[in-house]
Amino acid sequence: MGFSVAVALKALEVSHGEVENALDLCVNGIITDESLEHVPTAPPVPVTSHGGMTTANRVMVRRVIDADNSCLFNAVGYCMEKNRRIGPKLRKIIADCVRNSPDVYTEAVLGKAPKQYSDWIQDPAQWGGEIELFILSQYYGCEVVAIEIKSAHAYVYGEGKNYSRRIYLLYDGVHYDALAMAAGSPTAPESLDMTQFPAGDESSKQAALAVAAELKEGRQFVDLLGCTLRCMVCNKGLSGQEEALLHARETNHQNFGEYKSS
């Protein structure tokens, strides 16, 4: 069964470079050329001029998004529309996309029947992930670069689609924040933030990676695999990924640290 270069690139992106997994996605028809065309597009988002300032006059900063189970959606919303309360709208866009393309977003892809997934993702208590970033990248027509603090790796959703712009998100293992270029100082008004960048802008990418590296050095990330954690909000001890995720969903606490016995 043949498949296009665009399909192969998208499969590699979704599988984080794991060739065997990417091949399965292509051969089994989970990612197809049709699937790359089934997402509605957002109305044009005006790009605000910031008085001619370039990234050289700016500093990359972390813009904190509320830990309300919609951090992924609101982080994207801040970068694209300067809106931290856009979760319900973006959840509905994703739900409609999944519901209208059941041949593309199959149960094998979603882990749930498309109708069930559409209902599930509109529940404000549920978290978004890679599928949502993939769809939102196509909806806005831009690359969404999610930088994982622990690995210092940049996962690019929309790579190879010839989009002209990109945004940056910061991921600590359970929570997404937005990254923005502040006007000269981290304390500059957020209204002057630059949140969209040319897709090929290496300087903004390196600045975003530098923020992640600094946070990694300070161990400001959550290692969910096999370690003992402590909730830094209520001080509860937790064991591994399942307990941490369950605690986060039940309490909205999303600040964890590794537990070290004295």
Predicted regions and their residues:
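Short, amphipathic alpha-helical interaction segments embedded in low-complexity terminal/linker regions
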Residues: 1-70, 79-89, 96, 218-236, ...
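Short, well-structured alpha-helical patches and their helix-loop capping segments
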Residues: 6-7, 124-128, 171
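Alpha-helical elements of the RecA-like P-loop NTPase motor core of helicases
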Residues: 20, 73, 177
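Papain-like cysteine protease catalytic cores
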Residues: 44, 49-161
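Deubiquitinase catalytic domains
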Residues: 129-243
